[in-house]
Amino acid sequence: MFSNELKTQLSHNNYKVRLLSAERLSGFEKTSYSYFTSSQLSGGLDISKFNTYKDYGQQYGLSTSAFIILKERLDIRIKIEALLSDLFKKTIRLVEEGGYLKPKMQNIDGGEEYGIKEQECHGMKEIISLLTFLYDDSNNCIIFDEPELHLHPQFQSFFLNEIRKIAGDPKIEADKKLFFIITHSPYFLDIRSIKDLQHILVCHNHQKTTYIKKDDIDEH
């Protein structure tokens, strides 16, 4: 797959790369990976297996460790909580019950607290996962494969704006991150000037990838 090849090449160039594949929610709600034989949301995340979740997430491009990061990183959790409050009028709480970590949510205006179940809240799980890895400084390069999945265009645009705030080359500015976005959504095409066209590759079936070279722009 293109995303895995890209991850390999970037790793060889000494970037600390995190891939979030198009199937990143697997392990939360699917059984397509042998280790995740049942939903990790219905019963919670086994606290004794946190390191295993992280390793599998890194290996397969899964977002399973997102809630673990939120549990371990108060600074990131505070950011996510503030955004959930502003965007969705909801709060999130990470509860430890019987050796398992269970994320639970509640509407700000009242109502009972509820768990994030495997067959619902797709958009909520996506935005929480994407933002968590965006804010996590463990990696300085992230590949987002189809970040638009389950996201309303409004939140696609919001997420792109969050990416813009920290996008750059970490080898030049240590607090920046390098981003690669594989997408079918026009809301993730970040074109503000003709020079920005240099940053876009267009993939075709049975044809070579096309892109605009710097010399092409200079001619115009």
Regions found by a protein language model. Give the residues of each.
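A short linear hydrophobic-aromatic micro-motif
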Residues: 90-94
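Short, well-ordered coil/turn elements that cap or connect secondary structure elements
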Residues: 12-14, 89, 174, 194-195
